[in-house]
Structure formats: C-alpha cells, structure tokens
Curated annotation (Swiss-Prot):
Residues 267-326 bind DNA. Its main location: nucleus. Residues 387-397 have a biased composition (Polar residues). Involved in gonadal development. GO terms for cellular component: nucleus. It comes from Mus musculus (Mouse). This is LIM/homeobox protein Lhx9. Keywords: DNA-binding, Homeobox, LIM domain, Metal-binding, Nucleus, Repeat, Zinc.
Amino acid sequence: MEIVGCRAENNSCPFRPPAMLFHGISGGHIQGIMEEMERRSKTEARLTKGTQLNGRDAGMPPLSPEKPALCAGCGGKISDRYYLLAVDKQWHLRCLKCCECKLALESELTCFAKDGSIYCKEDYYRRFSVQRCARCHLGISASEMVMRARDSVYHLSCFTCSTCNKTLTTGDHFGMKDSLVYCRAHFETLLQGEYPPQLSYTELAAKSGGLALPYFNGTGTVQKGRPRKRKSPALGVDIVNYNSGCNENEADHLDRDQQPYPPSQKTKRMRTSFKHHQLRTMKSYFAINHNPDAKDLKQLAQKTGLTKRVLQVWFQNARAKFRRNLLRQENGGVDKADGTSLPAPPSADSGALTPPGTATTLTDLTNPTVTVVTTVTSNMDSHEPGSPSQTTLTNLF
C-alpha cells in the first residue's frame, strides 16, 4: 500500500510531512508513527521558544531592549549574542584584557580587579601580592635576590647610593637617613653637615637624637664594632697601636678604636691580651725571621690560637720597635728606654732562617737572666763588619 500524505486533525500542529512511501506496513502502524512525529515537533517548538529570548542565550542576563548594555572596556553597545560579566560589568569578548600585558581573559579561569583595572593572575601577584622595592617601588618576586636594610627591601640593581648611584654590594659600609641609602663617603659628608645643603648637621643630630648615625654593612645589620678603617688623614688614628711598654711579667695588648665617627665623639678602646706562652712563641720566631710569610703565619696561628691578622700586626709593630731601637743603638749605643744593648738586624744574605752550620740556641726569652748567644759565620761577618759575633735577644722586647 502506498500512502502519499495524511489528513491533519483540527487544532493540530501545522506540520506537514513530505510524501512518503511505506511498503508492507499496516494502516494502524502508519497512524501511530505520524502521531509520534507530531508530538515530537510540538516539544521541539516549546524548547526552541524557551531557549531563545531576543536573539540571545537564556543563560546570559537579559538585556533591556529600551536600554542596551554598554561594554565596560570600549564603551560601545553590546549587540553580540554572547558577552562576559566581570566585576558587575558587561564586556565584549575581545575587550576583557589585562591592563598590563594585554592578555585576553575570555578563556581564562580567573581575573583580578584592582582600583577599576583588570589584571591577569601573574601581573596581579607580581604587583600587589609581594613586597615592593623601597627605591623603585616595583614588585619583587619570590625568586629574586634582594638586599635588606632595616625594614626595607631593595632590588640588587636598586641598592645604590642616593648621591652618586654607586652600587653597594655585600660587605660595603653604608648609612641610612629617611629610608635613603648613602655610601660611606657621602654618609660621612652628610654627618659633617656639608651634604646636602638643605640639611644641616645640627638638624640631623636633633632628628636622630644624637651626633652619630649608625653604619651598616651589606648583611643588613647594624655594625656594632669598629668597621675596618680605610687610610684617611682626616681620621688621624692608627688602626692598631702596639703597647711598647710591656715586659715579661705583663701581657702585651693591641689597642683598637671602638667608634671613630664622628671625630668629636669620645672613643672607646678594646684591648687584645696575649698570654705568656703566646708571647714566647712569637718572640722565638721573631728571633729567627722578622717577616713571616702566609705559611709561617698559619703555623703560628695554630700554635698560639691567635688570628693571622693579630699576628701580622704584632710582627709589624715588633719590626718597627726593632728598627727604632737599632737607630737608638747607632746614635747612642744604648737604648734609653731600658738601658740595654740591642742586636743588629739579620743580614739580607743570611736569609730568613739561620744558615746551616751555625750553632743556634733558643731558650726561654721571657727570663731576663738568660741570654741567647748565636755564633755568626764568617760570610755574615764580612757582610756586616760592625755586627758583633754575639747578640743578646733577651731584652729585645
């Protein structure tokens, strides 16, 4: 049986299926198929009407036809079917961008707003979620190396003197005033009232509560002790003064200034004492070699427990005293300080150590009653015609 069409009931859907040809199907089955097709067409019509509203998706907020929405980015009307809603504002898909890197945020999961500006995640955390450099006021990421001074943090390139822009590194001395960093030279000038012109030394002292401002080093802590001094005629103070009046029964000392800044401030002294066995070891070696090298200083440091710097200073002052006493001996023949005869310096040809074949005797140099007699070879006598064959080292120190 061939069916070309079917008759529609009154008040039924105006759907008209095209002419179809059915073979081997009874009339009852054909009628059921047509009714099912009409039911499905009505359901699809209701879904289409519910999902379309003014030509837009129902999931988006409805736009009033009287007052169309304006894009918060470009300010134009939104006539697209899809738009974005961020911080209670409507945006074109192409207009929601990061204000820093211009990255389109339509496909991003998150965006951030600050003072009316839109940021992506990276720029927001870079600018607002980390500490800022005290010099350039830009963000510092967690992976960057920084310099710290008091409560401030600086980029490595921003930690410079506010006057000469000299880059300050770890270990350099610097001063701070009103969150400004100065190198040592300009900070000393600032203390003396010569720089800057609008800030006098009296005002600086009144603001800081004293006449001196602290120094800092590159580690970000206040320099409590005396910083290592550079040779400057303005300071006029020796780094280390050897106590030349010491004897065997008194410990030697190294005098150091505590704080030389400013010059008008009263200085404090920190004294380094030597024990008797340390003095004996140093004096015994001084009798052999007046100028020990780095290897000898290392061995002496292990024996005495002193630092190489302290040993260098002691030998430096001992050589100076030896030369001074030698000049006194040449002029008067007798050291006026203790009234004892002094030995001549070792010959340059003899080397640092006693030559082979020379009988050398080292005893306790701290005992004033024992003398050390050294027999000098004939070549040394020819090089030093005025030097005696016997020298007394007991009262040298």
